[in-house]
From Swiss-Prot:
PROSITE patterns: FAD_PCMH (PS51387). GO terms for biological process: cell division; cell wall organization; peptidoglycan biosynthetic process; regulation of cell shape. Residues 33-197 form the FAD-binding PCMH-type domain. Belongs to the MurB family. The gene is murB. This is UDP-N-acetylenolpyruvoylglucosamine reductase. GO terms for cellular component: cytosol. Pathway: Cell wall biogenesis; peptidoglycan biosynthesis.
Length: 304
């Protein structure tokens, strides 16, 4: 079916200004790479998300969901079908010792609002550059904390297009994985169960973690964050460093000289450069240590 026909159907449920055709996705990724989306939409309600999914299902059109593009590499050929951005869904509500946040809200903002309401438990998330939906999707974590520790439940869209609630156990959260990944569900919102705390102590902990992050991570360059999962008993960055790859460059991307676990875009690098670098790192580290590195970053889309 022609794209304009799909767009006409989408316009019945979603405002025209929130629908784009042949949209460059590098505008929305932390790596500043990626090709174009056939159709890119930005729903402003859960009902609009459901409507878009129904249209895609009826027309057998593939759908890809994007949060804030922090831990993802979109290939240079872009993404076919409909890309649904959840970044217009940013509502955050505080009720007692709990916070409920829509999928597109920044997890950093949720941690700050928790602090402002004297609630402890989300300090670890004060520097995670991801959306709430992405954080649940991959059970995001840092400095000893993870989403699994604090999430009470999430509202998700299942395969039938129904909105259902999954509690902590049903989410099957584990190291950088969840039932959301396995079943390709869509997170609409998440509720976090926190505890009362002292605002000065909370801020102090956040300051410590922020200083640690800024001193160790190459925040001055575009990157996708941690590229590789942590191998049991090892650290990916140390293995890469031991393989003499720190500072190594392919095309416009480089293994960060500040933290070897990061690949930074130093000179208009492409997604192909990122993929080539990842493959080179995996091959070299395996030859050097016998350890196979697995990617943490999601790689999606079509090659050129």
């Amino acid at each position: 079916m022609e794209l304009h026909t799909i767009v006409d159907q989408l316009k019945k449920s979603i405002q025209s200004e929130h629908i784009k055709i042949n949209e460059p996705l590098k505008k929305y990724t932390y790596t500043k790479t990626g090709g174009n989306a056939d159709i890119y939409i930005m729903p402003t309600s859960y009902t609009e998300v459901q409507a878009a999914l129904n249209i895609a299902r009826q027309n057998d059109i593939p759908v890809t969901f994007l949060g804030n593009g922090s831990n993802i590499i979109i290939r240079d050929g872009g993404i076919r079908g409909i890309v649904i951005s959840l970044l217009n869904l940013t509502k955050i509500r505080v009720h007692g010792h709990s916070i409920t946040a829509s999928s597109g809200a920044a997890i950093i903002d949720v941690s700050r609002i928790a602090r402002d309401h004297h609630l402890t438990g989300l300090e670890f998330a004060c520097g995670i550059p991801g959306s709430v939906g992405g954080a649940v999707f991959m059970n995001a974590g840092a400095y000893g904390g993870e989403i699994k520790d604090v999430i009470d439940h999430a509202l998700v869209i299942n395969h039938e297009g129904e909105i259902i609630s999954l509690d902590n156990q049903a989410l099957e959260l584990d190291y950088r994985t969840s039932i959301i990944q396995k079943e390709h569900f869509v997170v609409l919102e998440a509720s976090f169960k926190l505890a009362p705390g002292d605002i000065q102590s909370i801020q102090s902990q956040m300051d410590i973690l922020t200083e640690r992050r800024e001193s160790k991570q190459p925040l001055e360059y575009p990157s996708c964050g941690s590229v590789f999962r942590r191998p049991p008993g090892h650290f990916a960055g140390k293995l890469i460093q031991d393989a003499q790859l720190q500072g190594h460059t392919i095309g416009g991307v480089q293994v960060s000289e500040k933290h070897a676990g990061f690949i930074v875009n130093v000179n208009e690098g492409t997604a192909t450069d990122y993929e080539n670098m990842i493959a080179h790192i995996q091959e070299t580290v395996y030859k050097n240590s016998g350890i196979a590195l697995e990617t943490e970053v999601r790689i999606i889309g079509e090659p050129l």
